[in-house]
Amino acid sequence: MIHLFCLSRYRLYVKINKKVIKMLNRQKNDYYFNIFLNLARAMYMQLEKDWDKEAKLCGISYAQQHALWLLHVQDGLTLEELGNIAIWNKSTTSALISRLEKKGLVEKRKDEGSRLIRIYLTEEGYKKIDESTNTKECIEYMGLFKDKEEEDVVRVLSLMKELVDEIHQGKNPDFNTFINEYSQN
């Protein structure tokens, strides 16, 4: 009788401990996610602020600079591909490209034998990218990883990509293709 009581008490203890462990794991996961979210937001907000300041010195907006940079990396994107990679909606992407086209920084070309229209940097667009990324601040930002061990950089970037993949869950194939191709270079 005492033996059965101890056994059932042990089962209750194990059941309670599993609940406590599950609760603690949930709290730990919530804590890590909160830290991740705040770090990601802080990094994004500061980078956007600084890149916007640099872009304005060159007479373009942060979004325009971002579009030019994406086209510099992968020229000939369609409006849809560019919007998906930059995570912009169609109207934002279209308006942005129209403004860049008026400034003579990009041009649209129709694919031969297709209805697709692709966007390409003009000579002026390439010059604007050079101008907007050759400032002291931009060079410092782009050199963030120069003093880091390559395996640490690869590990951090791989983890970030893994997290983005989990968040996107395959919802943005253009973004995934761009990141995969860019990370191969």
Where are these regions (language model features)?
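Charged, amphipathic alpha-helical coiled-coil/dimerization segments
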Residues: 99-155
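Generic detection of well-ordered alpha-helical segments
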Residues: 38-41, 45, 49, 53, ...
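N-terminal helix-turn-helix DNA-binding core of bacterial DNA-binding proteins
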Residues: 49-92
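N-terminal leader segment of winged-helix/HTH proteins
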Residues: 1-58
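Core alpha-helical elements of the protein kinase catalytic domain
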Residues: 69, 98-99
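Terminal interaction helix/tail motif
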Residues: 134-185
